[in-house]
């Protein structure tokens, strides 16, 4: 699932080499922490959050087939 997420994100951004995805696994939950270049954050979120919502919907759909819960968080660099 991490590779699937990476494929989607890298095709949306201008700097795919700066995409970082950290996977944190719990008992029945997987949390993906996404870091992208600062100028690409807007592309990931999309207008009114539509793009990130669509990505999360796809992840939840794939995860439900495997009986796990999934969460996607965008990490902001300081």
From Swiss-Prot:
Record keywords, A-Z:
Cytoplasm, RNA-binding
GO MF terms on file? RNA binding
Its GO CC terms are: cytoplasm
Q: Name one Pfam family in it.
A: KH_KhpA-B
Where does it localize?
Cytoplasm
Query: Can you give the residue ranges of the KH domain?
Result: 29-78
Q: Which cysteines are joined by disulfide bonds?
A: none
Q: Say yes or no: keyword RNA-binding present.
A: yes
* Purpose: A probable RNA-binding protein.
Q: Belongs to which family?
A: Belongs to the KhpA RNA-binding protein family.
Q: Which PANTHER family match?
A: RNA-BINDING PROTEIN KHPA, UPF0109 PROTEIN SCO5592
The name of this protein is RNA-binding protein KhpA
Which organism encodes this protein? Chlamydia pneumoniae (Chlamydophila pneumoniae)
């Amino acid at each position: 699932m991490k590779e699937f997420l990476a494929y989607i994100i890298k095709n949306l951004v201008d700097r795919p080499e700066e995409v970082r995805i950290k996977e944190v696994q719990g008992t029945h939950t997987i949390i993906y922490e996404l870091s992208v270049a600062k100028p690409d954050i807007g592309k990931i979120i999309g207008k009114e959050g539509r793009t990130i919502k669509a990505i999360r919907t796809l992840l939840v759909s794939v995860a439900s087939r495997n009986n796990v819960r999934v969460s996607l968080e965008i990490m902001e660099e300081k």
